Amino acid sequence: VTSAGATAATPARFSTRMSRQFTLSFTRERLRSAKFLLFFWFAARFLILATWAFITPATQGDVVYYYQKIQVLFSDGPANTLQEYPTPVIWVLLIPYLIGFGNEHGYVIAFVCMMLALDALFSWSLWHSGGSMGGQAVVFWTLFLAMVGPTAFLRFDLITSVLAGWSIIFLLRRHSAVAGGLTALGASVKLWPALLWPALLPGPARQKFRATAGFLLTGLAMVGLSLLYAGWDRLLSPLTWQQGRGLQIESVWATLPMLARTVNSDNYAVTLSRYQAFEIWGPGVNTLLSASDIFFAGGLAVAVLAYLVWLWRGHGRLIEAVVLVQFVIIVMIVTNKTFSPQYMMWLGGPQAAAFAVLGTRSHHVEEFYVDRSRLNTLSMWILVATFLTLLVYPISYDFLVNDWNVRDSLLRFPATLLLAARNIVVVIVLIDVIRWVWSFLRPRAVKAVRQRRRGVEAPQ
């Protein structure tokens, strides 16, 4: 839904047209056909695996890194293994090591098969929980991971994306305690899902209590097990590991220095840090690093404020909870000084679950069509940003970081333009989410809901 003053050239009107055309390419019959969706899923996954095998085999580098770290786990001990990640990650990454019989090739294959199985299970849950929009949920998720490319199955960020999506689905099915527990499990793999807990509290007091209890009990259990397994220092190591990081070349903040490097490479240097990330150094970079720290903290403060206003307003709808989840995620992505390609995966699970949420709603109210239009538009922009991320990494990444020959220098400019375009679209995603959040948290909307609550609660 666009504003009355929007012209045909505005991004909002353009995105609405594109999302409508995209939606029409999948007929109602196809969206309701399990056979078609299964074929579509297999075709998309075959494309991802073929891309990995024949075009970008180097994308498995992180999985090989996991293997190497797990291989020395038995000699170095858990306190000195994968210190950049929460302790439970060791247990997750130990599974493919055991399945692959300690062999590197076996480890990579087992890891990919684990991620494929998780993907298939999440797709099945979207289909069975999505009501009238289960087909749309599966199509979005299938396309989304296809746009992510081989990275989808070669990083464990898929786990957190799926757990965030399942939290929403279980909340939809009124299993609040399970939703809270899944959110805590996500936080035990990557820390950021802990920020999603307030989104589990839109319902009555009993639901809030169960969601919070599930979150706290699961979280405390994971903390206790981690403490017993690897000790206090290892428990805290992920919190301090990132402190010395520089400006990663893919971050939104690095866009201007990366563009400047294409015309004046002598003033800028791209180096591989000890964090296994390429960072840019040069004029203005330190200022941008300071700005990113300020905006990151400010962005999270705004997200907390949005949660508080939403909970104070009351009568929170589940689709609003999903939008707030996406707001937290996209704020972290845009304002952070780091931005790895797998971060885009964080948006996919909750966005797919949003279709399931709408699919269980009545189609006879105006709110449904407004929310559906907004969801389709946001989904389109997320898919565009994700596809551009694939073009940046792994397709053109070497041209961004290498200075080995004339070919690298010549192709650096178009590769950097791709990176800049991706970052612009990611900012558009943030703006789109902010507009949606503002639609139900602006003062007039909050006042209307609270007046309606007082009218319902007043004695007759």
Where are these regions (language model features)?
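Multi-pass membrane glycosyltransferase architecture that uses lipid-linked
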Residues: 13-240, 288-460
